[in-house]
């Protein structure tokens, strides 16, 4: 009995577990054999595997398009491309938060998108954890409540982005910013309208800045509104460091 015949002799639930619910590659010829199998369950499994292929191909194309700006810069010799985005004001009139991320070249993380489009908080948290693990480096910056009152919300957002950029552990060769330009930025930069939906680096920064666990962290560190909160920087080889 050939290996393909051995697989086809297995119960459909076992095949589903092997080739649909796990990431195990489908052996050559198995999908076509399932499509002509007389068992209804086999045909349904083949249909779902085909759908997964189409979904993966579509997601791969979407993720590649998110790298259009990064690819352009990489080909020009800018190796370290940072994305910077401001996530807005935290709950209960808290600080303005911004993130900065440098992704590895050709980085494609399934589900990476503008944080505003990721409505599931657990999914956003999962992506944030993975981005931080994979990133060349990342940082978060804050503008405090009293700073918002003093310089207004727009300029506080710029300040938070500036702080996030300054706390990256490695200096970017180029910076992509969501819709704005960072004041006193030491690296060349480009503002991109709707950048969090068009650039993988900016999208990653928006997710890091909007991490759901942060409000709990702020509350435990600074229970009194207006208390200065730490600026956080983390790389693969570093622990969280306060200002």
Predicted regions mapped to residue ranges:
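RNase H-like, Mg2+-dependent phosphodiesterase core
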Residues: 1-82, 89-243
């Amino acid at each position: 009995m050939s290996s393909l015949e051995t697989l086809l002799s297995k119960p459909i639930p076992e095949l589903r577990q092997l080739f649909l619910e796990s990431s195990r590659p489908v052996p050559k010829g198995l999908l076509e054999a399932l499509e002509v199998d007389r068992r209804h369950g086999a045909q349904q499994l083949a249909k779902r595997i085909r759908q997964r292929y189409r979904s993966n191909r579509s997601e791969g194309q979407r993720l590649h398009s998110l790298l259009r700006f990064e690819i352009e810069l990489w080909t020009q010799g800018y190796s370290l491309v940072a994305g910077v985005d401001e996530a807005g004001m935290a709950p209960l009139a808290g600080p303005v938060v911004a993130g900065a991320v440098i992704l590895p070249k050709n980085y494609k993380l399934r589900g990476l998108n503008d944080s505003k489009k990721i409505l599931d908080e657990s999914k956003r948290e999962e992506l944030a954890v993975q981005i931080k693990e994979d990133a060349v480096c990342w940082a978060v910056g804050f503008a405090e409540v009293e700073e918002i009152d003093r310089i207004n919300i727009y300029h506080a957002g710029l300040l938070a982005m500036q702080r996030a950029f300054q706390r990256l552990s490695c200096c970017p060769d180029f910076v992509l910013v969501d819709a704005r330009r960072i004041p006193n930025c030491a690296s060349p930069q480009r503002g991109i309208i709707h950048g969090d939906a068009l650039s993988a680096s900016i999208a990653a920064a928006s997710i890091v800045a909007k991490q759901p666990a942060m409000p709990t962290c702020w509350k435990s560190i600074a229970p009194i509104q207006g208390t200065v909160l730490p600026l956080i920087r983390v790389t693969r080889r570093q622990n969280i460091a306060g200002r």
